[in-house]
């Protein structure tokens, strides 16, 4: 039986086959299908992705809500991840989203892990260091969502910058016909990057969490003095808060290769407050002033690991 679809209302599907059929039918009528993948616990950062998707002329927006077990590493509590489906659907309805895809793990992986996506070497760096299977899980589920929905564009936030870069790599390397759109990080009034993890912070931790964005901002302001200066400025801000356990502070190029001596770069940080792990990053323009160490010195410093 053909799945029902009512234009202008939120239609919720749990079956991959139903979403595929509805998406195909909508494309045949000239609608442009936009996909916003999420794991639920929606906040204004997710809604910024939805609004960016809705701005595309002729678009119909599909938001997937799926807590993907493949991207949780050993020691990470899959069951503890926040699940707020009713609230999420209410938010999507208020935003005028027309399709929500809320599959179960059994529906997404009916044959178990028989076939998965193997990421490239970047998967072992930064976020992949302590979580060696994480990006294989991310890329596998995104690849499946792309096959199920067949969107014209797929939207991701720049907060999870390594994820965005790796999805772009997969789309290019596997010749997947979709445009990957990165949306700038949405922040709280004090600069903290919006994240579903922020709800785990107590009041004191919430005040300290802004240190990450403050450190990145300090680094960006110092970037005109070179990459090493940007890292020193950011490190000084982080060092002033002993409650923070910093996993890494690294300067990379836009594709997360070695940091450039000058030009566009990304400063990335991951740190823990109690049991909550926070991520953030910022784009900056590196300059190399006359008389400084030069490109080799900056590059070596920019790739050095964090030392507490």
Curated annotation (Swiss-Prot):
State the residue spans of region: Disordered: 286-308
Q: Write out the residues that bind (R)-pantoate.
A: 71, 163
Which InterPro entries did the record assign?
Pantoate_ligase, Pantoate_ligase_C, Rossmann-like_a/b/a_fold
Q: What is the top EC class of this enzyme, as a single word?
A: ligase
Which catalysed reactions does the entry list for this protein?
(R)-pantoate + beta-alanine + ATP = (R)-pantothenate + AMP + diphosphate + H(+)
Keywords (alphabetical) are:
ATP-binding, Cytoplasm, Ligase, Nucleotide-binding, Pantothenate biosynthesis
**Gene3D superfamilies membership:** HUPs, Pantoate-beta-alanine ligase, C-terminal domain
Residues forming the catalytic site: 46
A biological process from GO = pantothenate biosynthetic process
Q: Which domain of life is it from?
A: Bacteria
> Which pathway does this polypeptide act in?
Cofactor biosynthesis; (R)-pantothenate biosynthesis; (R)-pantothenate from (R)-pantoate and beta-alanine: step 1/1
Q: Name one GO cellular component term.
A: cytosol
Q: Report residues binding beta-alanine.
A: 71
Q: Does the keyword Ligase apply?
A: yes
What else does UniProt say about it?
The reaction proceeds by a bi uni uni bi ping pong mechanism.
Q: What does this protein do?
A: Catalyzes the condensation of pantoate with beta-alanine in an ATP-dependent reaction via a pantoyl-adenylate intermediate.
Subunit annotation:
Homodimer.
**Entry-linked NCBIfam families:** panC (TIGR00018)
Its recorded name reads Pantothenate synthetase
Q: Which organism is it from?
A: Mycobacterium avium (strain 104)
Q: Which gene encodes it?
A: panC
């Amino acid at each position: 039986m053909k799945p029902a679809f009512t234009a202008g209302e939120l239609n919720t599907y749990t079956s991959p086959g139903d979403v595929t059929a509805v998406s195909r039918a909508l494309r045949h009528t000239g609608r442009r299908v936009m996909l916003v993948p999420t794991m639920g616990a929606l906040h204004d950062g997710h809604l910024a992705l939805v609004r960016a998707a809705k701005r595309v002329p002729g678009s119909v927006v599909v938001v997937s809500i799926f807590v993907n077990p493949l991207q949780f590493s050993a020691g990470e509590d899959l069951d503890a991840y926040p699940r707020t489906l009713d609230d999420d659907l209410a938010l999507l309805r208020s935003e005028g989203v027309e399709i929500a895809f809320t599959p179960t793990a059994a529906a997404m992986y009916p044959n178990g892990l028989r076939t998965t996506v193997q990421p490239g070497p970047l998967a072992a760096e930064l976020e992949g260091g302590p979580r060696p299977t994480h990006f294989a899980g991310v890329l596998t589920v995104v690849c499946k969502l792309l096959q199920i929905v067949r969107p014209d564009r797929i939207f991701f936030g720049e907060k999870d910058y390594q994820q965005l870069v790796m999805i772009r790599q997969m789309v290019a390397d596997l010749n997947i016909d979709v445009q990957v759109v990165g949306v700038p990080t949405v922040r709280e009034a004090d600069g903290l990057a919006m994240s579903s993890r922020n709800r785990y912070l107590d009041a004191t931790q919430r005040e300290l969490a802004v240190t990450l964005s403050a450190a990145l901002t300090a680094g960006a302001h110092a970037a005109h003095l070179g990459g090493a200066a940007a890292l020193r400025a950011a490190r000084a801000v982080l060092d002033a808060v002993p409650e923070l356990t910093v996993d890494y502070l690294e300067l990379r190029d836009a594709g997360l290769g070695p940091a450039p001596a000058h030009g566009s770069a990304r400063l990335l940080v991951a740190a823990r407050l109690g049991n909550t792990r926070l991520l953030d990053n910022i784009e900056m323009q590196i300059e190399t002033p006359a008389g400084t160490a030069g490109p080799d010195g900056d590059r070596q410093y920019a790739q050095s690991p964090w030392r507490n």
